[in-house]
């Protein structure tokens, strides 16, 4: 009688065993390595191979806009897109110096301006300057421009040195498709117009 602790296995020749292992490996290898196309329909697999970034781009792009002030306009603040570091993305458009919101949702809206001026001479009358910058919303829900972000400052120019003041503000807002975002600025002749100092934008969260 065979002892219980010993098991007898049938002897298999080396060549036969190798062939069995090779066949098993060929069956399991595609699934184990996660080769492209496994688990996909033929059309889906072909699309993934031909356009590997197409689906990723559609899923990650969100509406966004970044505008800069036009330096060629000294007495007005006109916004520009598609130049330097300015852009319009995924539905945003610029019309009548206003951003048009492409889809309803929550957006982060921001803007910055920088003002500067020269020192006054002792004989000149040094009167205070009122500087202000405001981001406004015009919507079908309101018959007028509603202030969203606002900054004001009174500047008293000195007699010896030039002056420089900046204003930045930004916050998140619930916006509706078709809403218009614009700005109003007091003290435009004192603006320092460059891509890094005067800008305005919004992006979907």
Curated annotation (Swiss-Prot):
Name of the molecule in the record: Lymphotoxin-alpha
Disulfide pairings: none
Organism: Pan troglodytes (Chimpanzee)
Glycosylated residue positions: 41, 96
Source superkingdom: Eukaryota
Record's signal peptide: 1-34
Gene Ontology molecular function: cytokine activity; tumor necrosis factor receptor binding
A family per Pfam: TNF
Subcellular locations according to the entry: Secreted; Membrane
A GO cellular-component term linked to this record: membrane
GO BP: cell surface receptor signaling pathway; defense response to Gram-positive bacterium; humoral immune response; immune response; lymph node development; positive regulation of canonical NF-kappaB signal transduction; positive regulation of chronic inflammatory response to antigenic stimulus; positive regulation of extrinsic apoptotic signaling pathway
InterPro entries documented for this protein: TNF, TNF_beta, TNF_CS, TNF_dom, Tumour_necrosis_fac-like_dom
Similarity comment: family membership: Belongs to the tumor necrosis factor family.
The keyword Ligase is annotated on this UniProt entry: no
Keywords: Cytokine, Glycoprotein, Membrane, Secreted, Signal
Primary localization class, coarse: secreted
Function: Cytokine that in its homotrimeric form binds to TNFRSF1A/TNFR1, TNFRSF1B/TNFBR and TNFRSF14/HVEM. In its heterotrimeric form with LTB binds to TNFRSF3/LTBR. Lymphotoxin is produced by lymphocytes and is cytotoxic for a wide range of tumor cells in vitro and in vivo.
Subunit and partners: Homotrimer, and heterotrimer of either two LTB and one LTA subunits or (less prevalent) two LTA and one LTB subunits. Interacts with TNFRSF14.
Domain THD span(s) in chain numbering: 63-205
